[in-house]
Amino acid sequence: VSSNIGWTDETWNFLLGCERVTKGCDGCYAITTANIRKSNPNPKIATAYAGLVERNETGRLDWTGQIRVVEDRLHKPLTWRKPRRIFVNSMSDLFHADVPIGVIAEAFAVMALTPQHHYQLLTKRHARMRAVLRSARFAEMVLHWLRTTDQWLPAKVRVSAAQRAVAIKTLSDRAETEPMNPLPNAWIGVSVEDQATANLRIPALLDTPAAVRWISAEPLLGPVDLTAWMAPRTPADPADAPSTWHEWTWPDWVPADARQQIESFWSESIGRGPRRWLQNAHDNGAPAFGQEWTTHPSMRPAGSPADRHTGRYIHAWNNIGRLALPDGSMGYTSFTERHVRDQLGLHWVVVGGETGPGCRPMHPAWARSLRDQCRASAGTSFFYKQHGDWHPAPTQLVLNDPAWTLMLCGDTKESWTFQRGPRHHNELDGEVIEEYPVLLGAVR
């Protein structure tokens, strides 16, 4: 179904039904939508939504807890040839406990067979998301679906042998005991409404294999600090860096051995210097200077019994780096584009205020803070969806304006208004910000 959600093109609702889990669910639009659609004059639609919502003992409209798989929608993206961004299950949660793991695997097989699309998955069930996507058994289930397409695909859907072979290769380049390689076109995200849910869900997201990791902070109900999960920028842009090491100042945490090796390799005496060093880091897509970085097992420091070592990254040359280890010593590491992607942290942050009856205002300072955090990071894109039904009021009311209810927030310079109806209030400080994550190629 074509979508009016600003950050997607299409919704793929092969699951219906859900349950509230945190206060971000209090104004859930899907409950109201399901209640309307259960009375749709089209019997097919009415049947699909029947029994999903009811009024509880307090009179509140709520989910019944029933989860329904709509089988004839599961393969729909295979019929969409034009590339598009697809929001997976806006009317449910793919990782709800009652969604069969076989259905999740079948959905991932469909995603693997349609690399022209980008799939946007969003969940509040962070624990099951991590458990499923880190499971070697789940990887084998997805591969089974891919190897048996002739047994389950509808007759009208055509998948070429080459298309299937590419999908199988993408997912099978792994040891049998390892989780599935991330699908390059699957963006895995969690919902975050305040700092508590950020602290709860984001660590699980970062521990989940994903090509793109993102959060939806909508409705945003409080201030959120994401800097712990964002990569820092390099200390200077190459163009602004000094040309000699004499002018360069190393942070105290950089080990002396690392300084000596880097300054020797990038010596001005052979036409190099800090400017060339930073440009090399930029050209090779290196991790950010000072970013927390975990070594690949094959690159552990000499003499170390640990399979993996974590420290702060310092670029050396090409795809080679050094680590400032917690004890002050130097370690060795390297990277591929895939490793950078996996350790980058959050790639995308979507922010929006709440809409609908009883909606709660979003303070503009909360949104501004997230915007500024993204802009200060190395690679986290920011998408501002909307203020919500509470939004800045116009400076003047003129004849034939709609009715306004004005409220002056004591800690802002703006008057705010509550207005239901068409929503185009997507400017933050006069700017429309609709960034998408930088998509990295799949590196094996």
Q: Could you tell me what each predicted segment is?
A:
Residues 1-16, 20-22, 26-185, 195, ...:
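Conserved Radical SAM active-site core
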Residues 2-13, 37-40, 44, 173, ...:
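Auxiliary Fe-S-binding modules of radical SAM enzymes
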Residues 85-87, 118-120, 185-189, 212-216, ...:
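Structural preference for beta-strand elements that scaffold enzyme active sites
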Residues 90-98, 186-190, 351-360:
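Surface-exposed cleft-lining segments at the edges of enzyme active sites
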Residues 92, 125-127, 192-194, 219-221, ...:
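Active-site-proximal loop/turn and secondary-structure-junction residues that shape catalytic pockets
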Residues 104, 198, 367:
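Aromatic/hydrophobic pocket-lining residues that form the small-molecule binding cavity
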Residues 134-139, 206-210, 372:
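Short, surface-exposed basic-aromatic patches at helix termini and helix-loop junctions that form
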Residues 193-198, 363:
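Active-site glycine- and acidic-residue-rich loops that bind
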